[in-house]
A protein has these predicted regions:
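S-adenosyl-L-methionine
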Residues: 1-49, 57-66, 85-113
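Conserved beta-strand/loop positions that form the S-adenosyl-L-methionine
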Residues: 51, 74
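Conserved glycine-rich SAM-binding loop
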Residues: 54
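Conserved SAM/SAH-binding beta-strand->alpha-helix loop
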Residues: 77
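A short glycine-rich, Lys/Arg-flanked "PGG" loop and its adjoining helix->strand segment in the class I
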Residues: 138-152
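Conserved beta-strand signature within the Rossmann-like core of class I S-adenosyl-L-methionine
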Residues: 152-160
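Class I S-adenosyl-L-methionine
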Residues: 165-215
Length: 215
């Protein structure tokens, strides 16, 4: 595990920033172990994960529209987590939770295998300068982690307004043997904050379906 991940986990475990509410913000006792999702939600239901959920606008809308499913927003920034928390409380959503941790680390280390029905990756930071490309979330390793966490035939839904980044994601997807390009499932009823902001721009979408190993 890289130093940035370790520093973040140490910060959280020190409770420098206390949890907002234990029934909404997930604060694991062990950040190195998979989450106990049944204990967190009090049931077994299909799980959708909003990677980099921002202020929670998209998260609460899809959670409200789909009470038979559970929803997890993952966000690194405290201010955005507070905003998402507030929205969940205001809407009284029993099926929505938020986890404050680095997104790539959560996917790699904290989500159990075969646990996620659908990942939403909406407008990930494109890091347009070449020297910053290594910071982009979508990499070969990211695809491996997502594949492990998805249920059979599970989906990864990616939305961006950056054509160069989109082409790079397409290239990585085409090289992967773990996913097939799928048609978009029923569009969510509410756009994300970034989708509203970039509504006048060209928006690029890609949905990848997990390919399970043949046994």
């Amino acid at each position: 595990m890289g130093d940035p991940h370790r520093r973040l986990i140490q910060m959280l475990q020190s409770r420098e920033f206390p949890a907002l509410a234990p029934d909404i913000e997930i604060v694991p006792a062990n950040y190195f172990a998979p989450l106990d999702l049944k204990s967190i939600y009090g049931r077994s239901a299909p799980l959708e994960v909003d990677l980099g959920c921002g202020d929670g606008s998209f998260l609460v809308e899809i959670a409200a529209a789909n009470p038979a499913r559970d929803f997890l927003g993952i966000e690194r920034l405290l201010g955005r987590v507070r905003s998402a928390h507030r929205k969940i409380v205001q809407r009284e959503l029993a099926n929505a939770r938020v986890l404050r941790v680095e997104t790539s680390y959560a996917v790699q280390q904290m989500l159990p295998p075969d646990s996620v029905t659908l990942f939403h990756l909406l407008f990930p930071d494109p890091w347009p300068k070449r020297r910053h490309w290594r910071r982009r979330i979508v990499t070969e390793d990211f695809f491996v982690s997502v594949h492990r966490a998805l249920v059979p035939d599970g989906l990864l839904r990616i939305v961006t307004d950056q054509i160069d980044y989109f082409r790079e994601i397409e290239r990585l997807a085409a090289q992967s043997t773990q996913f097939l390009i799928s048609s978009d499932p029923e569009p969510p009823r509410a756009p994300s904050t970034f989708e509203k902001r970039f509504s006048q721009s060209e928006i690029y979408r890609l949905v990848l379906q997990k390919v399970s190993e043949v046994t």
